[in-house]
């Protein structure tokens, strides 16, 4: 069954703490559409506030009104500096809390359990400050699923009040709507500036204030806006006692956002992110910011630069008397296309740099090559806040978040030198104080840390640049300032996590440790819910508290075996190497062509013919009927791995005398040059049959093609296939630069999508853009380190880039990694492909390789005339490789060994491939290469399955040639009985 995806996007505008989701379902073609088949049946928002902090819990009930099972995907951004700290999913009608699990392990367990048609729940952090979960199954005909997400946040200061703001401008009725807000330890009445309806009012009980409303069939149209007045200079300190004599503290200092004058620049660089994702920024806010800036800095030279998959210089403008109309018009007409590659950034020499971007480099790694003050400016809901802060901190600039701040106010960061937190005076009784690096004071300031002991006095320093101009004194008292039922430690952990994630790769282990202890979702840790307690035992995952007793009892009594992992593939690889060597030594000679026999022959001739027939060593008949090709899928031959080849000396006496297959053995010292056979590869372009291709039918030059593409892109902007097909047209018309721009835009379509990045890697390999092929492959490996194909793709990309040692190391990892039983079964036989590729590297680049760690039992000289490998970008997909030789014999899954020695690897029916065809010595004539799409079990944002075929002649001989074919499946449903012709050999 093809899985249909839902996507729920929670968009958070200014001061937003949550937002009602927009619900969409897959259109079956890689995009999404609005639908009333799945609705938000219930929305419950519960917020608890104490001091300047809040804990927010959002509960959603999704109802499936369709007649089919649905799989939901919820993707939502959270405000700057905030991470999800709680996740729960209903199991058998009851919410079960998630537990922290390493991100890669959570994915692996998810993939493994999914093979049993039981889906766990996983909440993970993807690129930027975005969080994603999947809900499956949602039963048909009114089935419901409940999920709950919790996060902690700090109230924002606006003027002399702290503000809690919740937008509730939903466009459709919600069958059940509940909102409840509780304010603790407040002596003053919270002020309702705006409320959803007349019933929502605060009621006081002691020093606790509560307001709530419960509606049915309700369409909320008014927002919730609560103000909390504050006195200037006041302090609010909350503490939570911990083990030993330690306490966590959170001190909120009510600061004035002071500033002092600075010399305004004479020249500025406006660096404008014009990648495809750039169109999603709020350009109106960006223009308001610039308008306010030029009102103050009225005479300045502005040089424009653009970053997408390339770095481009724009025009230069002279701003006079604050008139920036020309610049505004110029920026308003920018078109957005291509991926985002911060690795392309060039050195800029202007006094200051204004960098307008979301901070997500989707097509290359960040390289810092300038030291001029850089002001990173974000107006997008989806942004990599840590990347943006890193750039601004590194260059002594500032980060401006237009999405959560008024551009007219935050412009002062560009015009003045702001007051900054500069640290604390050394105090041995406090540790792990955050922030630990200088931080600009916007409206207020929060300091967190750990106190050892009962009390201390802490001196906090503020100033400009490196100059301390003000010191605040705060008193910490664990007895007097302790609060019950508030996780102050979670706020501390969040602050620490924010700093660690600025350098997430270097701090990977510490991020995991912190997330594991405090249940935070991070770039390295996810939150996971499993269906039954046995799975927690099996996969060695500590369960939530409600299952701990049952979990411990099972472990104690050893009633459930822990997951049986396959330690590595080395033993199978050794067996397969011997198998390949035996096959390689076996000599195949095709049956000579038989001519009509005369009817009048002598008796002796007949006898002689009969004598010969008695000793024929028969192979597979060359006259195969079409019935072979029509065998049912269920008829499987024994895996080549399980066959035994016997090289006998006896048949050698028949050499040259027997009709049929002649068998011999090859000398171990036979040179690779003896295998070289001059041949020709012809690849066939698989043309797209998409309806939009008619738009380009008369376009015969790159400029026209690109213009048509931009003109019609809005209609197809979420279809990767559209970019893929147009890029192919541009490559075909010899415009590699434009083709790469269109192709790279695929990277901006979704967050952490391995299917899209595999598609990119395939096409980049074909286009010989090897550095970007490596980047895409490494991203997939980062997201899916449990797939052997991830290491293989990275290895082959390293080889394309000339890094043969890294290629060898990553291929070898495929054989030395451990795998779950389910994934090992899925990829059974992959070692055959890996062995050929390891030995090809050794054969062609031995002098450049360190082989000390390579098992000699898998090393063998195995040159061949023909090698073909196909793989594809989707899991749970079955693509077949067919090769038809000059004798018209087809080698495929039901005929894995041919008369002339063709050999096909194991048939991969549930994973990403690969499948491989080998032929040691090519028979003279033409060979036909086809692929057959047998089936896929899901269609997501990536669209139809992408297939890559690597076609070699004289492989591992030192004279090998390669051609690449990449295409997307053209058949939307079912099997293509005729196959797709992708190439031919001729020898």
Which residues make up each language-model segment?
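Generic helix N-cap/helix-start motif at coil->alpha-helix transitions
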Residues: 369-371, 684-688, 716-723, 736, ...
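N-terminal, polar/Ser/Thr-rich
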Residues: 18-51, 116
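Von Willebrand factor
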Residues: 261-356, 360-362, 383-384
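Intrinsic-disorder/low-complexity signal
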Residues: 841-987
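An acidic, Ser/Thr-enriched
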Residues: 86-91, 97-125, 134-139, 146-271, ...
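VWA/integrin I-like adhesion module and closely mimicked acidic/polar interface patches used
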Residues: 357-402, 406-413
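Short, small/polar-rich motifs associated with maturation and membrane association
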Residues: 592-678
């Amino acid at each position: 069954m093809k899985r249909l995806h839902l996507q729920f996007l929670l968009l958070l505008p200014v001061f937003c703490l949550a937002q009602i989701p927009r619900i969409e379902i897959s259109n079956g073609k890689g995009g999404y559409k609005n639908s009333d088949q799945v609705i938000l049946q219930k929305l419950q928002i519960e917020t608890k506030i104490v001091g300047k902090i809040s804990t927010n819990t959002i509960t959603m009930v999704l109802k499936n009104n369709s007649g089919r099972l649905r799989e939901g995907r919820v993707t939502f951004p959270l405000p700057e500096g905030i991470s999800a700290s709680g996740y729960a999913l209903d199991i058998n009608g009851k919410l079960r809390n998630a537990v922290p699990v390493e991100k890669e392990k959570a994915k692996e367990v998810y993939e493994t359990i999914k093979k049993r048609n039981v889906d766990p729940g996983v909440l993970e952090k993807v690129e930027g400050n975005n969080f994603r979960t999947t809900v499956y199954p949602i039963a048909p005909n009114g089935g419901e699923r409940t999920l709950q997400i919790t996060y902690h946040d700090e109230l924002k200061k606006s003027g002399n009040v702290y503000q809690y703001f919740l937008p509730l401008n939903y466009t459709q009725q919600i069958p059940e709507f509940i909102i409840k807000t509780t304010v603790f330890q407040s002596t003053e009445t919270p002020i309702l500036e705006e409320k959803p309806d007349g019933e929502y009012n605060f009621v006081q009980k002691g020093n606790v204030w509560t307001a709530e409303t419960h509606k049915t069939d309700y369409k909320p149209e008014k927002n919730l806006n609560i103000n909390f007045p504050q006195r200037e200079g006041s302090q609010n300190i909350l503490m939570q006692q911990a083990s030993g004599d330690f306490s966590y503290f959170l001190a909120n200092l009510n600061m004035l956002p002071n500033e002092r004058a600075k010399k305004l620049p004479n020249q500025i660089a406006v660096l404008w992110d014009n990648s495809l994702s750039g169109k999603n920024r709020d350009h109106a806010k960006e223009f308001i910011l610039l308008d306010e800036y030029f009102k103050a800095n009225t005479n300045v030279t502005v040089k424009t630069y653009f970053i997408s998959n390339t770095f481009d210089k724009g025009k230069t403008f002279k701003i006079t008397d604050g008139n920036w109309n020309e610049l505004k018009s110029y920026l308003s007409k920018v078109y957005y296309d291509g991926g985002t590659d911060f690795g392309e950034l060039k050195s800029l020499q202007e006094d200051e740099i204004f960098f307008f971007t979301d901070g997500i480099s989707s097509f290359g790694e960040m390289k810092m090559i300038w030291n001029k003050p850089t002001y990173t400016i974000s107006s997008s809901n989806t942004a990599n806040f840590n990347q943006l802060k890193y750039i601004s901190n590194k260059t002594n600039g500032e980060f401006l978040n237009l999405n959560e701040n008024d551009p007219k106010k935050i412009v002062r960061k560009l015009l003045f030198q702001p007051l900054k937190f500069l640290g604390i005076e050394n105090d041995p009784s406090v540790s792990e104080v955050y922030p630990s690096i200088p931080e600009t004071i916007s409206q207020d300031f929060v300091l967190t840390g750990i106190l050892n002991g009962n009390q201390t006095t802490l001196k906090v320093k503020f100033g400009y640049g490196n100059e301390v101009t003000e010191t605040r004194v705060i008193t910490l008292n664990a007895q007097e300032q302790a609060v019950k039922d508030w996780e102050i430690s979670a706020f501390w952990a969040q602050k620490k996590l924010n700093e660690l994630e600025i350098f997430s790769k270097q701090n990977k282990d510490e991020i995991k440790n912190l997330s594991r202890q405090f249940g935070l979702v991070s770039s390295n840790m996810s939150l996971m819910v499993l269906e039954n307690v046995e799975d927690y035992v099996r996969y060695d995952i500590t369960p939530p508290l409600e299952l701990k007793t049952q979990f411990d009892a099972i472990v104690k009594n050893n009633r459930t075996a822990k997951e049986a992992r396959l330690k590595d593939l080395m033993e199978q690889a050794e067996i397969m190497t011997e198998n390949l060597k035996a096959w390689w030594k076996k000599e195949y000679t095709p049956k000579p062509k038989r001519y009509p026999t005369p009817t009048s022959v002598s008796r002796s001739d007949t006898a002689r013919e009969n004598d010969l027939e008695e000793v024929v060593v028969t192979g597979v008949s060359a006259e195969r009927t079409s019935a072979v090709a029509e065998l049912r899928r269920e008829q499987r031959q024994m895996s080549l791995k399980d066959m035994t080849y016997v090289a006998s000396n006896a048949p050698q006496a028949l050499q040259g005398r027997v009709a049929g297959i002649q068998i011999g053995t090859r000398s171990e010292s036979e040179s690779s040059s003896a295998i070289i056979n001059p041949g020709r590869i012809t690849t066939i372009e698989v043309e797209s049959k998409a309806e939009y291709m008619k738009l380009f039918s008369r376009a015969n030059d790159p400029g026209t093609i690109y213009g048509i593409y931009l003109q019609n892109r809005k209609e197809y902007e979420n279809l990767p296939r559209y970019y893929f097909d147009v890029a192919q047209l541009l490559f075909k018309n010899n415009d590699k630069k434009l083709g790469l721009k269109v192709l790279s835009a695929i990277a901006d379509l979704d967050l952490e999508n391995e299917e899209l990045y595999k598609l990119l890697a395939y096409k980049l390999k074909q286009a010989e853009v090897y550095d970007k092929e490596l980047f895409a492959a490494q991203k997939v490996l980062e997201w899916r380190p449990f797939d052997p194909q991830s290491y293989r793709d990275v290895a082959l990309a390293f080889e394309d880039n000339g890094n043969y040692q890294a290629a060898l190391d990553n291929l070898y990892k495929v054989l030395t990694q451990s795998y779950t039983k389910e994934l090992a079964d899925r990829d059974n036989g992959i070692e055959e492909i890996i062995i050929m590729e390891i030995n090809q590297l050794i054969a062609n680049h031995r002098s450049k390789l360190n082989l000390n760690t390579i098992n000699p039992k898998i090393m063998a000289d195995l040159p061949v005339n023909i090698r073909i490998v196909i793989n594809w970008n989707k899991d749970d997909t079955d693509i077949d490789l067919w090769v038809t030789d000059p004798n018209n014999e087809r080698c495929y899954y039901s005929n894995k060994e041919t008369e002339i020695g063709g050999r096909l690897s194991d048939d991969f029916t549930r994973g990403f491939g690969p499948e491989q065809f080998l032929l040691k010595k090519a028979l003279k004539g033409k060979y036909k290469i086809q692929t057959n799409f047998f089936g896929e079990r899901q269609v997501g944002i990536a669209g139809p399955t992408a297939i890559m075929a690597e076609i070699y002649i004289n492989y591992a001989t030192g004279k090998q040639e390669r051609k690449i074919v990449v295409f997307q499946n053209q058949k939307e449903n079912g099997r293509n009985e005729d196959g797709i012709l992708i190439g031919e050999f001729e020898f």
